[in-house]
């Protein structure tokens, strides 16, 4: 059984036991979160696709960690004009383990 869920502007195909990294969620470490924006659910009987979400479906996940990704360097310059700007950015993330898929 798997589900396709949306969170943080991205879509994830998950099964029970999967570990995923999503955009930062406002949750404490070791707490559980319910993700209700489930776009599709598939099991032995077939696939159920929502319009836009599957009614009554939810995915329960446990928060393993909160952190920041590796630094991305943004470097802008204009040739021959002595214009240089260097910026760094670290995107926050939440590490989840999928515990249960309900459809």
From Swiss-Prot:
Keyword DNA-binding applies: no
Entry GO terms, CC: cytoplasm; ribonucleoprotein complex; ribosome
Alphabetized Pfam families for the sequence: Ribosomal_L21p
Domain of life, source organism: Bacteria
Cited function: This protein binds to 23S rRNA in the presence of protein L20.
NCBIfam families named among the record's database cross-references: L21
Protein name: Large ribosomal subunit protein bL21
Originating organism: Clostridium botulinum (strain Eklund 17B / Type B)
Organism phylogeny: Bacteria, Bacillati, Bacillota, Clostridia, Eubacteriales
């Amino acid at each position: 059984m798997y589900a396709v869920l949306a969170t943080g502007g991205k879509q994830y195909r998950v099964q029970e036991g999967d570990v995923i990294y999503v955009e930062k969620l406002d949750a404490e470490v070791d707490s559980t979160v319910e993700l209700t924006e489930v776009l599709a659910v598939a099991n032995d009987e077939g696939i159920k696709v929502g319009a836009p979400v599957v009614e009554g479906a939810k995915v329960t996940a446990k928060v393993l960690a909160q952190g920041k990704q590796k630094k991305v360097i943004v470097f802008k310059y204009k040739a021959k004009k002595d214009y240089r700007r260097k910026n760094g950015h670290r995107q926050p993330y939440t590490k989840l383990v999928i515990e249960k898929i309900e459809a």
